[in-house]
C-alpha cells in the first residue's frame, strides 16, 4: 500500500452546502431534504478533522446559481425541470445557503462551480496546482453527479483520485 503525502493531499467536499443540507436551506425549506444525505456531514467530519491534524487540505466546491440583473438565478432548462423550487437567493455566492455546512468548516480552499464538474469554468485546477496538491480524496452528495463528474475531470488532469464510500 502506498502512503499518502498528506501535505499534497486534499479532501474535496463536493456540494456540502447549507442549501442542500441544512433544514433552513433551499432543499429543506421546500420539503426536499433527504435523511441519508443529511447524515453525510457527520460521517465526513472525522475524516476532515484527521486530514487537518495531519497537514492535509480541505477543499470545498460550492454549487452556485448566478443571479440575473433582475435577481432570479440563471438556471439551465434541465435543472429547472428537475428543481422547479429553486429561486432568487438560493445557492447565491456569499449567502447562508451557499456556505459549507458548519460541521465541516473551515475549508482551506473554496471554489464555486456552475455545473456538475467543479473543474468546468472554475478556478479549481489553478488553485490545486498552486497549492501543490497531487492526490484528491472525494466525498460529497450525489456521487453519480457532481462527485463523479469532478473525479473524471481530475483524472484527465493527472491527479491521483480516491472516492470515499460508506
PLM region descriptions:
Residues 147-157:
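Short Gly/Thr/Asp-enriched flexible loops that form oxyanion-binding sites at enzyme active sites
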Residues 1-106:
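Active-site acidic carboxylates
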Residues 90-140:
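Internal catalytic-core helix/loop-beta-alpha segment
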Residues 12, 59-61, 109-111, 137, ...:
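Hydrophobic/aromatic beta-strand patches that form the interior of the parallel beta-sheet core
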Residues 53-55, 132, 158:
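Glycine-centered short loops/turns at secondary-structure junctions
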Residues 51-52, 128, 154:
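A generic structural signal for well-ordered alpha-helical segments
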Residues 137-140, 158-166:
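A short glycine-rich beta-strand->turn/loop micro-motif centered on a GG-aromatic cluster
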Residues 122, 144, 148:
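Glycine-rich phosphate-binding loop at the start of an alpha helix
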Amino acid at each position: 500500500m502506498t502512503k499518502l503525502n498528506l501535505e499534497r493531499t486534499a479532501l474535496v467536499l463536493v456540494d456540502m452546502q447549507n442549501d442542500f443540507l441544512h433544514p433552513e436551506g433551499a432543499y429543506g425549506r421546500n420539503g426536499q431534504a433527504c435523511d441519508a444525505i443529511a447524515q453525510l456531514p457527520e460521517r465526513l467530519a472525522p475524516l476532515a478533522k484527521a486530514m487537518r491534524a495531519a497537514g492535509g487540505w480541505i477543499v470545498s466546491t460550492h454549487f452556485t446559481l448566478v443571479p440575473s440583473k433582475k435577481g432570479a438565478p440563471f438556471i439551465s432548462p434541465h435543472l429547472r425541470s428537475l428543481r422547479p423550487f429553486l429561486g432568487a437567493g438560493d445557492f447565491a455566492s456569499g449567502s447562508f445557503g451557499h456556505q459549507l455546512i458548519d460541521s465541516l468548516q473551515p475549508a482551506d480552499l473554496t471554489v464555486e462551480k456552475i455545473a456538475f464538474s467543479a473543474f468546468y469554468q472554475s478556478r479549481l485546477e489553478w488553485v490545486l496546482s498552486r497549492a501543490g496538491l497531487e492526490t484528491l480524496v472525494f466525498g460529497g452528495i450525489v456521487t453519480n453527479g457532481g462527485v463523479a463528474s469532478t473525479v473524471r475531470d481530475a483524472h484527465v488532469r493527472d491527479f491521483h483520485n480516491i472516492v470515499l464510500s460508506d
